[in-house]
A protein has these predicted regions:
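Extracellular glycan-binding segments that recognize GlcNAc-based cell-wall polysaccharides
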Residues: 1-117
Length: 117
């Protein structure tokens, strides 16, 4: 996490689970990516998780963007990690909740993979 995470409005809500730092069969990589605002000296304005090493056309974070490996299939001891999106604010968030934590403006995008508990 960036050092200024509190100023970004982030809050620690606890752990969702764990990723593996070691490749395994059916592993799917997860990256942390950033959206920059070109009108504000390319300041980072949003972070999001992605399975795409190209960050879906955005940018890898500067301090090491490879987060770890998720399972691409559900195996014992794993749960789905969902990615949700709020169009109005361009916010992505990860959750174990298939209804995006009941956030009315959020839409479920996809399952990033399966995280270890």
């Amino acid at each position: 996490m960036p050092q200024n995470w509190g100023k970004l409005g982030w809050r620690n809500e606890g752990s969702l689970g764990f990723v593996s730092t070691t490749y395994f069969e059916n592993a799917r990589p997860m990256y942390i990516c950033a959206m920059y605002d070109p009108s504000w000296n390319n300041h980072i304005v949003k972070y999001f998780s992605s399975n795409d090493p190209g960050c879906e056309g955005y940018h890898p974070i500067e301090w090491g963007y490879f987060e770890g490996y998720l399972s691409s299939t559900q195996v014992p001891g794993t749960v789905p990690l969902y990615r949700c999106y709020i169009e109005a604010t361009k916010d992505h968030f990860d959750t174990r909740s298939s209804d995006c934590e009941g956030e009315p403006a959020a839409k479920l995008e996809f399952v990033l993979g399966y995280i270890f508990l």
